[in-house]
Amino acid sequence: MQDIRLTTILNRYGKAHQRIKLVEEIGEMLAEVGRYIADGERRTNKANVVSELADVVIVIRQLYPDASKVERKVPEGEEVARLLCEKAASLAAMVAGAPFSKLELSYAESVLAFIDLFVRDLAEVPMLEMAIEQKIDRQIGRILRSEGADGNRR
């Protein structure tokens, strides 16, 4: 069952806007993961990486409520990061182009799976879960503040 907060956010901004937002968030995630890889996996501030991963997870969950983390054979360290970047870049290219397709859903599931593997490699699963919750709550707060008591936009 999809989190009602995600549905609220999607309804507020619309699918077309959130598809563009996904491309943007994937770009930011790719930059952070790229820095992590270039740093030889010694990046001291994992919070930046996890924050960008959370943004991607949130928008994927909005656009693809039926997406689940598909089981993946567990590759090693840098390989997970590389595969995550590859799948995310492919998803961004699809989202920026043609309308929704089943292949797009498959890539969304792969991205979620590789995010899960990557955050486990970072040993930061709780940080990701907390970041997702905080970011969703913050967005809902913005929506509520922008609407009057009658539910209309201000």
Predicted regions and their residues:
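Flexible "arm" and connector segments at domain edges
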Residues: M1-R154
